[in-house]
Every structure is written in C-alpha cells, then in structure tokens.
Amino acid sequence: MSNESLANLLKEERRFAPPADLAANANVTAEAYEQAKADRLGFWAEQARRLTWATEPTETLDWSNPPFAKWFKDGKLNVAYNCVDRHVEAGHGDRVAIHFEGEPGDSRAITYAELKDEVSKAANALTELGVQKGDRVAVYLPMIPEAVVAMLACARIGAAHSVVFGGFSADAIAARIKDADAKLVITADGGYRRGKPSALKPAVDDAVSRGDGVEKVLVVRRTGQEVAWTEGRDVWWHEITAKQSAEHTPEAFDAEHPLFILYTSGTTGKPKGILHTSGGYLTQTSYTHHAVFDLKPETDVYWCTADIGWVTGHSYITYGPLSNGATQVMYEGTPDTPHQGRFWEIVQKYGVTILYTAPTAIRTFMKWGDDIPAKFDLSSLRVLGSVGEPINPEAWIWYRKHIGGDRTPIVDTWWQTETGAMMISPLPGVTETKPGSAQRPLPGISATVVDDEAREVPNGGGGYLVLTEPWPSMLRTIWGDDQRFLDTYWSRFEGKYFAGDGAKKDEDGDIWLLGRVDDVMLVSGHNISTTEVESALVSHPSVAEAAVVGAADETTGQAIVAFVILRGTANAEDDNLVADLRNHVGTTLGPIAKPKRILPVAELPKTRSGKIMRRLLRDVAENRALGDVTTLTDSSVMDLIQSKLPAAPSED
C-alpha cells in the first residue's frame, strides 16, 4: 500500500440490537470488556480457571523474550481430560457429545462416556504402536468421529498431531510428514463425498513411500473399499482399538507442551507449520466458544460446518466445544448431497441452535435460491456465526433473514490459524451488530489498525490490522524455523503482530476486515480493497458471488477486473447487465471503484477450504501462465475462465 491510507468507501447504516431474552441471560456481558481492560492478565488468569488443572499456574504470562510467549508456564494439565473425562466425572456421561451424520445418511450419537472410552482405547493403541510423549502423528481422515478421537488420543498421551485436510495431494502430505518428522499416520480407506466413496489411503501410501520416518499407518474402515496393504506397517484401527482397555490414566503436561502443528500455505516456498501449545490455547478456545456463541451446554445443539483439517475444526469442533461439554453435530459430506437443502435438513433433524459456517457457503446458498431453506424448520436456531473471510453485507443480511428468521444475532469472527482462537467478534448478548463488520476485539484482546508508519489510524481511516499485546492461544513459532516466525509476523511493525490483513475503522471505531493485504489494488493513486468492490457487486440482485483483482494497467497503474457468478435468474448474455453492474459499483462506492472489466463465470477458483484464489485470477487478467494450482478444488475452472476473458468487453 502507498502512504495514503486504505480508502474507506463502503458505508453501512444498518444496525441490529441483541435479542432481549438472549441479552438478559448472556454468558458474557459488557462488564467483561471493562474487567479485561482494567487487568488483562488477571482476566486471562480467571478464564484459565474455567479449565481443570493438575497443577494450578501461578504465573499468567512470561513475556521476557518477546515475541516468544509462555502462558501459564508453571501449570500442568491434560487437554483430553478437560475435553472428556471431567464432564463424565461431573455426571454428564450420558450427554451426547457428537451427533454424527454421514453423507450417505447413516448416523450415530456418541455420549461423553462413550467418547471417554473411545479416546482411552485409542490412546492405549497409540502407546502400543510406540508413540510417545513429544512424538508427532499425522492425521489424514474424513469428517468422521474417529478424527476427533484421534486428535484427543494424541493430546492424551502428549503427542502433537498434524492434521492434513482430507483433500490434499500425496505431495502435500509428504511435505507435512517430512517437516514434522511424523512417526505414525492415521488415515482411512476413504470417506463419502458427493454421493460416492472417495479414497484416502492411496495418497498416504504414496506419501509414506517417499521417506523412511513413518513406522506405522493406522487405518480406519469407513467405506469398505479395497485398499492396498503393507504387512508389518499397516494396522486396522478397529482391530487394534477393540483389544485395548477402556481405562487410561491421563498424564498432566506442562501448559507449554506442544499440542499440535497445523500447516498453512505460505505465499512462497514450503508450508508453514504453525505450533500451538496446551494451556493458553485451550483457555482461549474454551472461553471464546463459551462467550461468542453464548453456549448453554445443557440445552444447545451446536454445529460448526468446517473440516477438522482447518484450524476452525481444531478450535471449534474438537477443543472449544468439547472443553465446554457441548453437544454438537458433525457432518461428513457436502452441502448439496443428495440435495441442496441437506444443511437445513440437518439443522431441522437435530434441532441445531448455534450454526458456525463460512461466507463462501452462505453465498453458495444465496445462489441456489431462497426457496430451499424455506422448506425446512430452522426455528431452533438462536445464534449464527461466520468464519474464514470477511462476509459481504448482503450475504450477512441474507444469512440473518433466510437462515435466522430475522431474529438471530450474527457473530462475524476474525481470527487465523496463527491466532489459534477468535480475536475480533461481536458478543451476541452485548453488541449492536453491523452487517459485514467483525466490530471489536474480544475482552482481553488488543487489536488496532495502523498506517505504513505504524501509527494508529483515526476513526474512518484504513490500513493494516495489528495485534498489540500477546494473547493466550497465539502461535508459539513456526515449527523448526524461529527466524521465519520472526520475519513473517513480527518484522513489519516493531513489537506488533502483523496479521497480513487490511482493515479499516468506521466512524464508531469498529473494525472492518478488508481481506489479505495482497488483495489491495492501487488504482489511480487510491488504495481500494477487493473486499469492498466484491461486496458492492454482491449487493446487486443479479450477483451471487464476486471475485475482484487488480491487473496491471498502463493508464491507472492497476485496473479493477471482476469475475462474477450470477444468481439463477440472471442472463450472462445480457449486454446491459455488465454496464448495469459497473454503474452499480460506481453508485455504491464511487466512480474510482468501477471495474474496468466484468466477466460472468459459472464457477470461481477456490482452495479446498473455500477461499477464492485471486492470485490465479490475477494471472489470467494479466495474460500470464498460471501459477501453482495444487490446492485448487477443480483446476478445470481456470481453463474456462482463461478462454473467456479475452472476449470480455472493457470500459475505455
């Protein structure tokens, strides 16, 4: 970005007060902000006491060697005990922990007592296979209960898990196994996806064959499909766990004992292994899940639609909800199998009260039409959440109206793999929400927006999002590469964590996320956020989803190029539509933000976690050979876009 701050073009006037009954009974009230402001470390010490410690910590934060934080360092706990055993001991063994819904329609309910037995058996099995405290275990599984059991079993014995998303290639698995030096891999024959079995083990076999570090491969039977078998290395999960005792005494580990490594794609070079540890991570994931969703474990049914391969699945399927004794839904498959109402059918079936999903899913549901959710009873819902990227205001309003019946608060949560837990979000019983804004840092979190010179921007100004004080669930380093950790996150602004996201403050001082800094366009000397232009396009009734990039332009430096997916009724061949869309952006944001080219497309290139790969669209817009497409869900999407773009009309 240039020295001029990020343009603040989008004005949002709509406001939604918290429902009175929710506010009256909220887990967390406005007092929490004051309490945390008065004594931040005392506040986090109090949240740590929500957990069960074998040795209570006496020191909250050791920041003697910044940016390497140690939280609750003299405390000891077992993360799996906190997620399972303590609820059984408190008399909640019969409460359902997981309502599993398989894509083919099979389902099973697992109580906390059953989960404790499953985790104990798996922990005993891992020990029998030679896994010890401090070892690393790679996990490559579909969205089945064994994925959660495997993670908790690792945590129980003090082995760090490295979960690899079940859609990644053998190359990606091999790189992650090698970097973490994993000695065991847990996988499955396959999982169900889009109505048919999708094999997982072949990719593991390929990845493991490339190195000599992996001693055993533990295989869950899910689909029953044929698998290649390596005698002496491969072990069936059901066979080894069946013969284990359901008794396992969990050992207490230091609060700073590694809990997991989770790889996130670097913009360049090899993936970054984000290291999270035990005490601080569990303190913040547990507290934020309790606070932001207002979870009442006796009555709520919670559903986070993420995959456990992403940090959202780690923090808000496995650790946060289970530490709070929640009952949750876990769904294996895709939202349109066997029909486009599958999610709403699940909400209706289990009486889901809290739903946490991503803007990319919400925009897809918008594209499919309002009539689909209308067929189902969604009246059980009381809190809706959004995660993964900034949510366009129109998608926010659609989500509230068509899924939330115009009554549910929406918590738009900003956080990252690196932050470990939610950082900026409304509180459902406190905040007057604004469509499209994550609003303000949660109690105990210090975040602001700064300009190029690290000066805090005034209200109405834009720049870079930074975190100014350490937080309990922060990443401790990049696995095996402290220097890269320093260079990536701490070198840009001295003493501040740089998130890599653009942001603005509105006139009230609330924070709006504007996407990755790489997604800011410099048009005729103005910094314009792709997020704002995309939101303007999506606010047009004909547009379901939009991706915007800046392409090199001789006249303006960069020109705005937009790729749009139209709603069902709109016609891509309508010549007036492109002009109409261009004018709509001009009216909404100002003439400077009008796209030079707009191309209607059937699909957009997305990563497996649903994020739009704007980098590839930029390659197309600038007539370059495509960069790395290995994380794309469907690479044929790009061939179509490449063939169509040259013919797209351009505004002179």
Swiss-Prot record:
Keywords from the named record: Acetylation, ATP-binding, Ligase, Magnesium, Metal-binding, Nucleotide-binding
Enzyme class: ligase
One Gene Ontology term of the molecular function aspect: metal ion binding
Cofactors required: Mg(2+)
Catalytic activity line of the entry: acetate + ATP + CoA = acetyl-CoA + AMP + diphosphate
Pfam families linked to this entry: ACAS_N (PF16177), AMP-binding (PF00501), AMP-binding_C (PF13193)
Record PTM text: Acetylated. Deacetylation by the SIR2-homolog deacetylase activates the enzyme.
HAMAP family: Ac_CoA_synth
Described purpose of this protein according to its UniProt entry: Catalyzes the conversion of acetate into acetyl-CoA (AcCoA), an essential intermediate at the junction of anabolic and catabolic pathways. AcsA undergoes a two-step reaction. In the first half reaction, AcsA combines acetate with ATP to form acetyl-adenylate (AcAMP) intermediate. In the second half reaction, it can then transfer the acetyl group from AcAMP to the sulfhydryl group of CoA, forming the product AcCoA.
Protein's recorded name: Acetyl-coenzyme A synthetase
Gene label: acsA
